[in-house]
Design a protein with these regions (language model features):
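A short, well-structured juxtamembrane/interface segment
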Residues: 16-34
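Structured helix-beta-strand junction loops
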Residues: 12, 34-35, 104, 148
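Short glycine-rich or small-residue beta-strand-to-loop segments that form or flank ligand, phosphate
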Residues: 34-44, 108-110
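Glycine-rich phosphate-binding loops that contact phosphosugars or nucleotide phosphates
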Residues: 46, 51-184
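Hydrophobic packing residues in well-ordered alpha-helices of helical domains and bundles
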Residues: 2, 21-24, 50
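Generic N-terminal amphipathic, Lys/Arg-enriched alpha-helix
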Residues: 1-16
Length: 185
């Protein structure tokens, strides 16, 4: 039973759109080079992936003598998330937070398994209204996020556990490759 899941996941991982993964990597790299902040958000398992990506960008990419990667997750301040969710609407929990930290040159990375999470779409629209760039990670064919994001990575699956595994693998690959690039400076 367990091997069946791993075999299916391996087949799905082999179908990852590598050109899209490279585009995401390049967007994060350019953000690092201009000393911007990578701001990440998502819901549920995608919120955990957002926090994990920020952790890896903040720790795995540390190279002695080099500037640190700037990264923040809109999912990590739960009092603020719940205050905005309670006082306005859950679809506004990210769009109400981002003006506190967003600066020109920052990059928003949104993670939504379905690509249709209203709060992820709202914050993406806000960043674009400020002239900013949005990376969207999704699955299930991409949903609305795939066409909204400037750079879209759609996991080739419609099974949420696989979509989340692919997003996490992408995040690990990003951190490893960014650390290699920083070491090469």
């Amino acid at each position: 039973m367990m091997q069946h899941y791993f075999d299916n996941l391996a087949r799905t991982l082999a179908q990852i759109p590598s050109d899209r993964a490279e585009a995401v990597l390049e967007a994060l790299w350019q953000t690092y080079l201009r000393d911007g902040t990578v701001i990440v958000c998502g819901n549920g398992g995608s919120a955990a992936t957002a926090s994990h990506l920020v952790c890896d960008l903040g720790k795995w990419t540390v190279v002695d003598g080099q500037r640190r990667f700037r990264a923040a997750a809109l999912t990590d301040n739960m009092p603020l998330v719940t205050a905005w969710g309670n006082d306005t609407a859950y679809e506004r929990v990210f769009v109400e937070q981002i003006p506190m930290i967003y600066r020109p040159g920052d990059l928003l990375v949104t993670i939504s398994g379905s690509g249709n999470s209203p709060n992820v779409l709202r914050v993406s629209e806000w960043v674009q209204s400020q002239g900013g760039q949005v990376v969207g990670l999704s699955g299930f064919g991409g949903g609305k996020l795939a066409s909204l994001a400037d750079i879209s990575f759609v996991a080739p699956s419609s099974f949420m556990p696989e979509v989340e595994d692919i997003h996490m693998a992408l995040c690990h690959a990003l951190a490893v490759n960014l650390a290699d690039r920083i070491r090469a400076l």
